[in-house]
Amino acid sequence: MRNTLKATTLESKLPLLAVEHGCIISKDADITVAFEVALPELFTVTSQEYEAMHGAWCKAIKVLPHYSVVHKQDWFVSERYKPELQKDDLSFLDRSFERHFNERPYLAHRCYLFLTKTTKERARQQSNFSTLCRGRITPKELNHEMIVKFMESVEQFERIINDTGYIKLRRMSDDELVGTDKESGLIEKYMSLSMEDVSCLEDIDLSAQQMRIGDKMLCLHTLSDTDDLPAKVSTDNRYERLSTDRSDCRLSFASPVGLLLPCNHIYNQYILIDDHDENLAKFEKTARNMNSLSRYSRSNAINKEWIDRYLNEAHSYGLTSVRAHFNVMAWSDDAEELRRIKNDVGGQLATMGCMPRHNTIDCPTLFWSSMPGNEADFPAEESFYSFIEPAACFFTAETNYRSSLSPFGIKMVDRLTGKPIHLDISDEPMKRGITTNRNKFILGPSGSGKSFFTNHLVRQYYEQGTHVLLIDTGNSYEGLCNLIHNKTHGKDGIYYTYTDDKPISFNPFFTDDGIFDVEKRDSIKTLLLTLWKAEDERVTKTESGELGSALAMFLDKMAKDRDIVPCFDAFYEFMRDDYRAEMANRPIPIYKQDFDIDNFLTTLRQYYHGGRYDFLLNSKENIDLLGKRFIVFEIDSIKDNKELFPVVTIIIMEAFINKMRRLKGVRKMLICEEAWL
């Protein structure tokens, strides 16, 4: 069908000449270096860190030469979560987790930085001289000396930003900018407003009523006049939704038009660096003219006062005069949704203290000048004079949560959008120097989800090979333990609890491999001493030594005679019969005041067959906890029992220390539920 409107090809209007060595060269001999920017994650930055990042931006911008353009471009594009169901090792709960979040919408954020070197003439041109309005573009010649100096300043800029430790700049390659046969480049993605790897070619409609790219309808809000700006700017603001009377949650000043704006949009931030001295000289001249005309109009006197204040600030604090511009370019393929987006953008700008200005006239030229590499085409009348410091406050300073690169971790969800992310809170923080150990402390009021989160954590740790030992109060982990017990057909998921029908029982004298190392022997000896002596009784060296010798003799006898059933009853009988006889036949007698074996046997009689606690140390299940990867000790019913609780505590300590000593290269976790001091 024949087009009745005035039309042309993108090729004839494209202002870009070439992309070489990571630099975009325009037909007007402007050179642009592109970076991908990695910002810190949302809700993880303090007020002091925001100030440090702001200071780094200001310091870096000052190293750029005159007639440079700093263009920071933040893309916020709606995407949907794609589940990882193709993995073979997914458990039932992991697979259910992935299915639950299938197609979950979220706002993906990508940040780019373009540093452009242009000329004085290009920096001053207005929108009617845009390359979009020219009939043809005649390429100009590059100045080699200018390029060398500019590239040196770009390297300094990159080094200053990267040295902060909060922001990382990565130089983009030619393929990332122009694309390959299989993937679209950034320039092509911008022309179609799509971050898909393979983007479709779209017609661009620059009609007077509305700009369209394919089915996408654009709306543009600009901050291009000082009258639209807030009375005060800062590096960061308090985020009231997550702040309390005692704690502050901080976000950057521009966060309302960043991740907090839930729609497809691009936030463009421009700082245009002119000749500082020329700017001040021009303002001095304007101030004199205003002073001369002040008798004819009071507004001239007021303008003169404002100009004087600007000049005084520049001279007093050594501030650099620059021009700035900020705009939010949003789009939608639905007219009703676009109407809602316009209101949302205006509302978010208002929360920043700005006057929302819906710009319908300059949308095509501002879209064109926001093209990567075409920053020098920015219309001068759309900028306002400011200083570097207040202008940099309008930079977004955070991104959404990123998945950890570590293969080990847990699945959590983004606090803002609910998108699942892979998070390593054990290894990666140590590698990055954030922590020096893997200890964790979970704090929260009743009902805040401490046990719920810990169930989620230990299940995923267990499924990745971790040995988990839990000390529980309140049966918070009974369900998870039963799940593991049934899944492993009883081989794992050991749950110890005390009931009248099934009292808690152990067998400290049993091991699968028959090995009793030094730690194991010491733990059994400590257990026996705890059962024998009261808390305020002192254990002598003779008593400790004799008990250690008796234990060693019993273990040697048990190793030689496989008919002996390893349990406390067998040890008690050995002490009563064999060891007592051995003591009587010694050439050096052992007196009762040194080691009273009768008192030992009498005190421990209650744990022997027929005694009150004969179940405690004579378990018939013969479970060696060394090889069990998920063990829960539910101690709620015995925590006040002075007889049982010390024994269970020692068993727990022995089990975990045994794992610590003997399981080399295996991740181990000890969790104390309700660890009150």
Language model features: what each stretch is:
Residues C23-A29, N102-L107, S316-S321, V413-R415, ...:
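Short glycine/proline-enriched loop/turn "hinge" motifs that connect secondary-structure elements
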Residues I31, C111, H467, R629, ...:
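The start of beta-strands in P-loop NTPase/AAA+ ATPase cores
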Residues P40, S47-V63, C354-M355, L366-I421, ...:
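P-loop NTPase motor domains
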Residues M1-E398:
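Extended, folded cores of ATP/NTP-driven motor/assembly subunits in large transport
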